[in-house]
């Protein structure tokens, strides 16, 4: 099942040189795991709540692939280039399959409550 790496980042007004190096190197860390950047820093349109910062969404063929990428020596080597300069949150999450049914999920959650 397709999985995603989703990051909510809060970059400073001036990006340090380390961030540019990170950006130059990240795709090479994604390629071996089938990672594809779907959203990267585009302007978000906030409809509910607040959203300071930038959104990054990376697609992977599976949660196993996403975990392997994040834990890979190649990514660990560049992670600090971003993380030391841009605070944020990152999660890895499974996507929904083509047969996802929100109503059935709601019924199951109600029954379990």
Where do the PLM segments sit?
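A contiguous, mid-protein "functional segment" used to position or interact
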Residues: 67-98
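Short S/T/G/P-rich N-terminal loop/turn motif that feeds into the first structured element of a domain
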Residues: 1-54, 61-68, 94-113
């Amino acid at each position: 099942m397709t999985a995603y790496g989703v990051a909510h980042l809060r970059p400073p007004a001036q990006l340090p040189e380390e961030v540019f190096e990170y950006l130059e190197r990240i795709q090479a860390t994604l390629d071996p795991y089938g990672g594809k950047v779907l959203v990267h820093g585009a302007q978000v349109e906030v409809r509910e709540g607040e959203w300071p910062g930038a959104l990054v969404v990376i697609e992977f063929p599976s949660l196993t692939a996403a975990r392997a990428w994040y834990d890979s020596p190649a990514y660990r080597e560049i992670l600090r280039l971003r993380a030391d300069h841009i605070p944020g949150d990152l999660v890895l999450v499974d996507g929904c399959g083509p047969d996802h049914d929100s109503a059935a999920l709601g019924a199951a959650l109600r029954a379990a409550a």
